[in-house]
Curated annotation (Swiss-Prot):
Protein name: Keratin, type II cuticular Hb3
Renumbered residue ranges of the record's region Coil 1B: 157-257
Glycyl lysine isopeptide (Lys-Gly) (interchain with G-Cter in SUMO1) crosslink residues: K217
Phylogenetic lineage: Eukaryota, Metazoa, Chordata, Craniata, Vertebrata
Pfam families in the record: Filament, Keratin_2_head
Length: 493
């Protein structure tokens, strides 16, 4: 879009306007401010008592100041010595179609909100960085605590190893005691086997003695039967002797009676006379001798047999008593040894159970320690991962912060460069002012004591932007319109 404008020199304006009047401002300040907006300079704050359409024909003595961010300029001029009449320009009575962009203020407000949001984000990033630093310190503290805790818990392993070594030594002692008790048990079993053999021998001897006793008893019975037979024979012989005695006595009595009845006594010298008394006496003596000898022999034999049997019975009874005592003693010894063996077995089983329980407890404690160690290692790994994530986020935040710092530094350098450029001397400044209240015409403007600048008024509708430049025109709008005052003398807008 081309913007043509007419040059207005410093002169005197007239106050006699019908609809369009030019008025000089009161003695005071004339300030034009500008705020940068996407490469377009927007100037605000022009004070001077303008109407809807007014043209300033002259300025009283005053001054202007620069108080804008991107480019600004103050204008001032000398007041005319008197008011002269001017001719009325009918073209000035035509209302201007400014076509101001209504979204400019909204865009500025959005810019402010975006700047606020960026500031809030920057503050949030700073807070997040601080929070991440605190979290980093907390994680470092936790890591140090877990490392110290791991070191403390790692000291438990030698204790468990010492306890396991003690249990192993006790198990070895128990095994040695078990071997010793096994050897003693074998010795006791050998002694027991010897006693069992002796007991079996004694039982065999007892059976032999009982057999001998039975045989001797049979012999005694036979002797007693023989004694009974001999006694019966002796009685029979005694009865027979008595019978024969009575018989001989009766025969003698009969013979004596016969002899006494005979009155003739014959005396004969017969040497062959039979003496029955002597014969009977001799027979009786023989029988008595035989009976006494038989009785004596039977009694002596019976007595000897009885003595032998009694001695054998006494001897075997003593042997049996000693055997019974030995058997009882062996039974007591067997019971005692059995009790000792049972006690040793119980003690061995208890020790084995204690060793097994100790091994199980050691295994459980070792597994628990390993599980705790694995949990701590997992927690440490997780903490390392969390710390790595936090470090990554922290690095990202620091990168974002660095980018923001670079942008801020870049903006600062740009602003400082622009201020430095503004502080330095500038050339001719073209001012294009358009607002909703009308156009502004400034003649022979001065910027900070520099050479006069030429002001121009765009009669065509503009976007409402005020542009001040040295040899360049800012865009006047988005529409393809031209300023009706003529062509731009310093360049195209």
């Amino acid at each position: 879009m081309t913007c043509g404008f007419s040059t207005v020199g410093s002169g005197f304006g007239s106050r006699a306007f019908s609809c369009v009047s030019a008025c000089g401002p009161r003695p005071g300040r004339c300030c034009i401010t500008a705020a940068p907006y996407r490469g377009i300079s927007c100037y605000r704050g022009l004070t001077g008592g303008f109407g809807s359409r007014s043209v300033c024909g002259g300025f009283r003595a005053g001054y202007c100041s620069r108080s804008f961010g991107y480019r600004s300029g103050g204008v001032g001029g000398l007041s005319p010595p008197c008011i002269t009449t001017v001719s009325v320009n009918e073209s000035l009575l035509t209302p201007l179609n400014l076509e101001i962009d209504p979204n400019a203020q909204c865009v500025k407000q959005e810019e402010k909100e975006q700047i606020k949001c960026l500031n809030n984000r920057f503050a949030a990033f700073i807070d997040k960085v601080r929070f991440l630093e605190q979290q980093n310190k907390l994680l470092e503290t936790k890591l140090q605590f877990y490392q110290n805790r791991q070191c403390c818990e790692s000291n438990l392993e030698p204790l468990f190893e010492g306890y396991i070594e003690t249990l192993r030594r006790e198990a070895e002692c128990v095994e040695a005691d078990s071997g010793r008790l096994s050897s003693e048990l074998n010795h006791v079993q050998e002694v027991l086997e010897g006693y069992k053999k002796k007991y079996e021998e004694e039982v065999a001897l007892r059976a032999t003695a009982e057999n001998e006793f039975v045989a001797l008893k049979k012999d005694v019975d036979c002797a007693y039967i023989r004694k009974s037979d001999l006694e019966a024979n002796s009685e029979a012989l005694i009865q027979e002797i008595d019978f024969l005695r009575r018989l001989y006595e009766e025969e003698i009595r009969v013979l004596q009676a016969n002899i006494s009845d005979t009155s003739v006594i014959v005396k004969m010298d017969n040497s062959r006379g039979l003496n029955m008394d002597n014969i009977v006496a001799e027979i009786k003596a023989q029988y008595d001798d035989i009976a006494s000898r038989s009785r004596a022999e039977a009694e002596s034999w019976y007595r000897s047999k009885c003595e032998e049997i009694k001695a054998t019975v006494i001897r075997h009874g003593e042997t049996l008593r000693r055997t019974k005592e030995e058997i009882n003693e062996l039974n007591r010894l067997i019971q005692r040894l059995t009790a000792e063996v049972e006690n040793a077995k119980c003690q061995n089983s208890k020790l084995e159970a204690a060793v097994t329980q100790a091994e199980q407890q050691g295994e459980v404690a070792l597994n628990d320690a390993r599980c705790k160690l694995a949990g701590l290692e997992e927690a440490l790994q997780k903490a390392k991962q969390d710390m790595a994530c936090l470090l990554k986020e922290y690095q990202e935040v620091m990168n974002s912060k660095l980018g923001l710092d670079i942008e801020i530094a870049t903006y600062r350098r740009l602003l400082e460069g622009e201020e430095q450029r503004l502080c330095e001397g500038v050339g001719a400044v073209n001012v294009c002012v358009s607002s909703s209240r009308g156009g502004v015409v400034c003649g022979d403007l001065c910027v900070s004591g520099s050479r006069p600048v030429t002001g121009s008024v765009c009669s065509a509708p503009c976007s409402g932007n005020l542009a001040v430049s040295t040899g360049l025109c800012a865009p006047c709008g988005q529409l393809n319109t031209t300023c009706g005052g003529g062509s731009c003398s310093l360049g195209r807008c």
